[in-house]
Amino acid sequence: MIKVLECEMSVIGALLCSDNDEALQTAFSRISPKAFSDESLQEIYKAIVKVWQETGKTDCVLILKALPEEYRARIPICMDLVPAPSLLPHYTAMLMDQQR
């Protein structure tokens, strides 16, 4: 379970750090909130998608404002798991593999 949670958190972290529009579009087209087993990560993912759809960016300040207080502490933890935003396609593929 820890590896699953770490993978899910890495996807969130990579989404938050990435500025690659193509990688973000691909990830958003492949991932649904149900791909996350953790409810807080589902809600964070929904907030990321909403902000991205409204602004074209994954702006952390706007995402934090869109989230209930209890989920906000997860954001920096997720971001710390990601050594490079360019790994978003890799983390997306890992998350999709877990769904099989």
Q: Each predicted region: which residue ranges?
A:
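Noncatalytic partner-interaction/assembly domains of nucleic-acid and motor enzyme complexes
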Residues: M1-Q98
